[in-house]
Amino acid sequence: MIRRWLTISKSGKKKKAVNDTITEEVEKVDFKPVNHDINDELCYSESSDNPSSSLFVSNLDTKETFLNEDNNLQISSGLDYSSETCNQGSNYSQDGIFYISNAKAINAYGGIITQGPEAPILAMKVSDSMPYGDGSNKVFGYENFGNTCYCNSVLQCLYNLSSLRENILQFPKKSRESDQPRKKEMRGKKPRIFTEASFEKSIAGTNGHLPNPKPQSVDDGKPTPVNSVNSNTAGPSEKKSKFFKSFSAKHVQDNNKKEGSPAILTTGKPSSRPQDAPPLIVETPNEPGAPSRLSFENVTDRPPDVPRKIIVGRVLNYENPSRGSSNSNNLDLKGESNSSLSTPLDKKDTRRSSSSSQISPEHRKKSALIRGPVLNIDHSLNGSDKATLYSSLRDIFECITENTYLTGVVSPSSFVDVLKRENVLFNTTMHQDAHEFFNFLLNELSEYIERENKKIAASDINSDSEPSKSKNFISDLFQGTLTNQIKCLTCDNITSRDEPFLDFPIEVQGDEETDIQEILKSYHQREMLNGSNKFYCDECCGLQEAERLVGLKQLPDTLTLHLKRFKYSEKQNCNIKLFNNIHYPLTLNVCSSINSKVCQKYELAGIVVHMGGGPQHGHYVSLCKHEKFGWLLFDDETVEAVKEETVLEFTGESPNMATAYVLFYKAMYSNAVEKNDRENMAKEQDDNIDNLIKYDDWLRTCNSGQKKKEELPIADDLDTAIDDSFVSNTPIKSSKKKSRMFSFRKS
């Protein structure tokens, strides 16, 4: 493969004299390593007149055309070349200029050069501290280890907050001496391969019912239980199945009337697994037949929702991968390995099955794991330092950002292990609370940043360099301030106390409906302190009647609202879930009644949804507003697109048992978006999703062909070894991995 470091030069003619030759004014742009690893020989155009030129470059803020008078793309270089280009008939020169002859108009989109006016799917922010981009074009699901949906839903919301993601990727700043190679793939210390054939054997032993595997890991060839749990529920599965009818029946009826517009998050009667659905199991390439972790909720517990566009978990017409290969988690798509491709957007998306929208969620989850790539983050990537929640979260973000592909599944086993080590409350088989996890995680991240800032400040004092300004971006992004004022009604003395908060609670009272906009448009809380609850006044030196006023003093950049739906019931002697209607808007105006200057407009950026009839059992999913792809539904391993109106349906209205639990609002600093602009934006986001899928399939095709080519010498060596074994009559062991059924427990 050819690697080239590129520097673009924009040509402009400038004549000094009549006989002078034309000189070039060069405008240099800094480039970082590209985001994909593609072999030039494996992606080519059918015609040399129309080369497949897709130069992935970075750090371009505006859309420009880089063509000289001969209609050639001109790229000058003073050092090494490092381009990720699929082209044909190109001339490479270390010292000269790189041309693509007879090329079409080639446009640069903030980090990408592609033919035609296609959307900039591969464009990302790139800097010295983010050499592989900011991860804004990546869409990954998270593997569920039995009851980790509470963790997955929150992590998805945090990743899709661009300001938080970028800060985590850049802090603490890595020294040049500790420069680590790019994480193009993440197999982990104990690689796992998800295959179809091994799952068929497991199905045969379960009388056709989908199994629910017991999470295990492999250590020295012996299966050992991993510190994960079996289920996210605390009761029988028949109790769980009721709450999956939470998605309103109205959604089904409305969408049945319109052909071609299937419902999102809707359910009727739970259906069983389709007979033709390909099963799945996991094999470990290092140890034949050794079981590994894999968790799915029971099929009857999942809603047969019909999404519009599936991004992760797409069911394609595929061939079985090589059983003996341990180099990839990806399937080889039929008809792609030998096909002639131009740019990915030039090829129509004919690989998605027309009936994929009818596939069950369980089938999509399996397809997501089979298709991969599965980023198996089973150990700390932080070197010799002890793993923390911050370093583990950064490992996840880095692996997603630096991965070759645009979509896939993350297996955050190391993060979950660290979480259970740091807080024993999460090291149980009980149903966990997503808000408690979010609050604990933010505090841990904030404390880590404070410790690192102290280390940096101490090193600056010992060195001759100027001390750097320490800041805590968790506090900057999430922390607001409440002011608590108590006025003595006897002497009118006012006592004030400020209270910081990372998330703002929304109380649920009785059977009343709650409108979040009405509460926060002029927020204040008044309470009379009298009777047995009198206030001790320092001025009066005694207990006095007083009035307490709570208001907003400072608003955060990201406002997190906790809808307090879980409450202890004395009558039932347990915690129950409240299904009061809580209405939340897409745009939220928050103002303080104490200080008129404290006012901010927010837009909804993410929701953690709890699906269930009580706090002891249920399932968490999240909906996040992606900056390029609009609203996406993240359900553990799978990701699918949803319409904006769907986001507002989780209010708790009966019989819907899927309710918004945690809301993320981002501050808006620009003018409001007009209705026409919203429609254009929605269309652009739909196009971006289509282009994302095409690009991702294209990248998989290129890399699939490359891996096949790399495996040819290995196969030749194996044939030679076999021939030698026949001559010497010495038996050799087969390299084929054997599968073995492992135990499952029903969720």
From Swiss-Prot:
Question: Key word Signal present in the record?
Answer: no
What GO molecular function terms would the record report? cysteine-type deubiquitinase activity
A Pfam family reported for this protein in Swiss-Prot or TrEMBL: UCH
| Domain of life where this protein originates | Eukaryota
- Describe the location of the USP domain by residue ranges: 140-668
- Residues of the region (Disordered) are 172-305, 318-367
Reaction equation(s) it catalyzes: Thiol-dependent hydrolysis of ester, thioester, amide, peptide and isopeptide bonds formed by the C-terminal Gly of ubiquitin (a 76-residue protein attached to proteins as an intracellular targeting signal)
InterPro entries with a match to the protein in the record: Papain-like_cys_pep_sf, Peptidase_C19, Peptidase_C19_UCH, USP_CS, USP_dom
Composition bias, Basic and acidic residues = 174-183, 251-260
**Where Phosphoserine occurs along the chain?**
S198
Q: Does the keyword Phosphoprotein apply?
A: yes
Q: Name one GO biological process term.
A: regulation of protein stability
Which EC numbers characterise this protein's activity in its record? 3.4.19.12
Keywords of the record, alphabetical order, are:
Hydrolase, Phosphoprotein, Protease, Thiol protease, Ubl conjugation pathway
**PROSITE patterns from the xrefs?**
USP_1, USP_2, USP_3
Q: Where is this chain compositionally biased, Polar residues type?
A: 225-235, 319-343
GO CC annotation terms, alphabetical: cytosol; nucleus
Catalytic residue positions: C149, H619
Do you know which PANTHER family this protein is assigned to? Answer: RE52890P, UBIQUITIN CARBOXYL-TERMINAL HYDROLASE
Further notes on this entry? Answer: Present with 125 molecules/cell in log phase SD medium.
Which family does the entry's similarity section mention? Belongs to the peptidase C19 family.
Q: What is this protein called?
A: Ubiquitin carboxyl-terminal hydrolase 13
Identify the species of origin: Saccharomyces cerevisiae (strain ATCC 204508 / S288c) (Baker's yeast)
